[in-house]
């Protein structure tokens, strides 16, 4: 993997910097590195493809070295270099796609394609120029079963989940009380509602709670907490739990009271915040518990009193909600990230070449299914293909 990264980094620099008119002295170190790459690769043969619709291609390396000059690089020099650069880039692209297309239930962190296995040989270690990539560093740690740490801006750690629970219901569905939520990616929105606006609740207060377990622990997380759940702020028709009917939800939004968010790790509370909105920090957690209250307003203007009558029918439904967004966090497991294109790159390659469903990844790389059942085998394979996708993205946009 390190060799693949070094090849790609060298080729990217060569493509960007070996241009007509450049002083040779400005790129002499790069050209020496480029020539070392050619010397190491010359005389070797590789084969890529042969899975799905990814065609089999054979690669041979027999290229001349780039010379020295005291002057600027001229058109002939650059054209000669370009021919070599483009062939190498095409080779790297196909090695990456071949690797992305493959998966294994055992030792999925290791190279799976014939070409990358060959590049992992001792004879190619002379190409190991630069391993400054975060993904390369973490691939090495994961490969040695040591602790890794990935910094994500918005970790897609929450499988999609959208549902409701009713704490009070009737066959007519005309006086309901409960919670509804949507969890996806890095955001949680939860709403508590009571058609009667806590009319008969103790002290006219309804208590709500929403617990969200994560598939992997996060550390040093920056989180935004807001006293609103905008996705539940408009009327909608909802299918009943048994699917036999539908019920009407017509929210009127109140501000939640006594809001508390707890971050837990292995059942132990690590951080607790009460009535604090905006930016909050969580040190280490694998579960989030949100609790909040709906308090019936003790004093109402006539207009508000008309919204929340003392007896049915209840046309408007008192609702309070919270939004929690994980803006950034460190995770020891590889995850899709809203600010990166690695999952999209991997999925598009597998779709474009009709890669058959294997023993590890779900059909279509369905992220919700993948993260819901996030096994060590999936984590290893995802670490490998994301690392390869990050290398490929250096050359192929």
Curated annotation (Swiss-Prot):
UniProt KW keywords: Calcium, Capsid protein, Intermediate capsid protein, Metal-binding, Ubl conjugation, Virion, Zinc
UniProt-annotated binding residues for Ca(2+): 266, 286
Protein localization: Virion
Superkingdom of this protein's organism: Viruses
Coiled-coil stretches noted in the UniProt entry, renumbered to this chain: none
Metal-binding in keyword set: yes
Gene Ontology molecular function terms on file: host cell surface receptor binding; metal ion binding; structural molecule activity
Keyword Lipid biosynthesis belongs to the record: no
Residues that coordinate or bind Zn(2+): 153
The record's account of how the chain is modified after translation: The N-terminus is blocked.
Predominant location: virion
Gene Ontology biological process terms, A to Z: fusion of virus membrane with host plasma membrane
Record's GO cellular component terms: viral envelope; viral intermediate capsid
Region (Interaction with the inner capsid protein VP2): 62-73
Subunit: Homotrimer. Interacts with the inner capsid protein VP2. Interacts with the outer capsid glycoprotein VP7. Interacts with the outer capsid protein VP5*.
Biological role stated in the UniProt entry: Intermediate capsid protein that self assembles to form an icosahedral capsid with a T=13 symmetry, which consists of 230 trimers of VP6, with channels at each of its five-fold vertices. This capsid constitutes the middle concentric layer of the viral mature particle. The innermost VP2 capsid and the intermediate VP6 capsid remain intact following cell entry to protect the dsRNA from degradation and to prevent unfavorable antiviral responses in the host cell during all the replication cycle of the virus.
Family statement drawn from the similarity comment of this UniProt entry: Belongs to the rotavirus VP6 family.
Miscellaneous comment text of the record: The VP6 trimer contains a zinc ion located at the center of the molecule. The zinc ion is not essential for either trimerization or transcription activity of the DLP. Zinc-depleted VP6 has an increased sensitivity to proteases.
Official protein name in the record: Intermediate capsid protein VP6
Species for this entry: Rotavirus A (strain RVA/Pig/United States/OSU/1977/G5P9[7]) (RV-A)
